[in-house]
């Protein structure tokens, strides 16, 4: 049997590889503390689960759902955006529920790119932006994110011959993996740049509700003209501890939303209706869970930053997101340092190069680790310092 070239050329997904390494270590009876994957360990709030249980017993929710989501869910999503960001959305034309935002991100390339087009993709970045673009037959032009520019892309440095073929610009703030944030002035620059060069902007914003020290991230759609040029992907996964329930949204430009809707309707059957109803409970109910989450993650951030500094690493505490982006010691590469930590301490981190070539020299640590495990990891890191 011969597989398609697109599959033959598809690299293994980064986090699948990491999970395999962890499983191998644990199968040998070794203790492993993993800071590798950003999957909240905190439970879904009880009032949200109660709505799911209630909805699951209703036979009307046992049938095929509507691909574009329940009207009442789209309305709840639009109202949440209005309350949170002051952004007004038409729930019928500018809101599309997704089976997790990753699904929409993966589909976007097929909606907005043809073979030979160019996608402008930050580097380092969540791997799906580049992989989905390549699967759709497009070329990827990397936009380096570096500390000197606060991990923001330099749009003016993009060559004209690239811009003439570029169709999509990906951005992501608060950022994964760097933890960087972007203000409204940057989003305004992006909206103006996209309008000038006829680009479709795809902003991935699932970490807007994970922020520290009183910081409040803004939405790309708050920029003037943003809805004319782009959409924003959001997720309930990180905000309400719902990664396992797979529900997110795309909002913004009506033409782009309609393209995603048409694509989805031909490939999937939508989000299970009971999960849509639990999402409504999350969006319409108390938002105190967000404050509670942020307090927990901030405490973890502070402990991890302190421990990394104690072993000689120059770490900046992130203002938002679930990640610490830490430069590795001199004489190490991202991969060699991550490997040494795993071999000598049993602590798993993600090498920065897993997110692109510009991630060289860094590792990423996630805050989605129970406090007890964090303390064990910190003890292991302290032991590493003594032995090195």
From Swiss-Prot:
Q: What is the lineage of its organism?
A: Bacteria, Bacillati, Chloroflexota, Dehalococcoidia, Dehalococcoidales
State which pathway it belongs to: Amino-acid biosynthesis; L-lysine biosynthesis via DAP pathway; LL-2,6-diaminopimelate from (S)-tetrahydrodipicolinate (aminotransferase route): step 1/1
* Protein species of origin: Dehalococcoides mccartyi (strain CBDB1)
What is this protein's record name?
Answer: LL-diaminopimelate aminotransferase
Q: Which residues bind substrate?
A: 13, 38, 102, 126, 176, 364
Give the gene name. dapL
Q: Which CDD domains match?
A: AAT_like (cd00609)
What cofactors are annotated for this protein? Answer: pyridoxal 5'-phosphate
Q: Which reaction does it catalyse?
A: (2S,6S)-2,6-diaminopimelate + 2-oxoglutarate = (S)-2,3,4,5-tetrahydrodipicolinate + L-glutamate + H2O + H(+)
Q: Which residues carry this modification: N6-(pyridoxal phosphate)lysine?
A: 238
């Amino acid at each position: 049997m011969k597989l398609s070239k697109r599959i033959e050329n598809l690299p293994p997904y980064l986090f699948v590889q990491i999970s395999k390494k962890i499983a191998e270590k644990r199968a040998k009876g070794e203790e492993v503390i993993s800071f590798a994957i950003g999957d909240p360990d905190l439970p879904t709030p009880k009032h949200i689960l109660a709505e799911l249980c209630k909805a699951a017993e209703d036979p009307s929710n046992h049938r095929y759902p509507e691909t574009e989501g329940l009207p009442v869910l789209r309305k709840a999503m639009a109202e949440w955006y209005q309350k949170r960001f002051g952004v007004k959305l038409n729930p019928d034309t500018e809101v599309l529920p997704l089976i997790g935002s990753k699904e929409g991100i993966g589909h976007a390339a097929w909606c907005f790119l043809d073979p030979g087009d160019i996608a402008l993709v930050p580097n380092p970045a969540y791997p799906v932006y580049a992989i989905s673009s390549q699967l759709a037959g497009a070329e990827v032009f990397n936009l380096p994110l570096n500390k000197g520019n606060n991990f923001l892309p330099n749009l003016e440095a993009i060559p004209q011959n690239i811009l003439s073929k570029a169709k999509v610009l990906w951005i992501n703030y608060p950022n994964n993996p760097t933890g960087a944030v972007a203000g409204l002035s940057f989003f305004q620059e992006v909206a103006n740049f996209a309008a000038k060069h006829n680009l479709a902007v795809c902003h991935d914003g699932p970490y807007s509700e994970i922020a520290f020290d009183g910081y409040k991230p803004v939405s790309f759609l708050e920029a003037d003209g943003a809805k004319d040029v782009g959409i924003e992907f959001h997720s309930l996964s990180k905000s309400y501890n719902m990664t396992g329930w797979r529900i997110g949204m795309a909002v913004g430009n009506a033409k782009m939303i309609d393209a995603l809707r048409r694509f989805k309707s031909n490939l999937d059957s939508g989000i299970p209706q009971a999960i849509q109803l639990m999402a409504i409970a999350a969006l319409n109910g108390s938002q105190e869970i967000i404050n509670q989450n942020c307090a927990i993650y901030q405490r973890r951030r502070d402990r991890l930053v302190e421990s990394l500094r104690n072993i000689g690493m120059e770490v900046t505490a992130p203002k938002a997101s679930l990640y610490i982006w830490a430069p590795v010691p001199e004489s190490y590469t991202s991969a060699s340092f991550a490997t040494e930590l795993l071999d000598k301490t049993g602590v798993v981190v993600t090498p920065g190069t897993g997110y692109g070539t510009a991630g060289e020299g860094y590792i990423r640590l996630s805050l989605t680790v129970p406090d007890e495990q964090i303390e064990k990891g910190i003890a292991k890191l302290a032991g590493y310092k003594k032995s090195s």
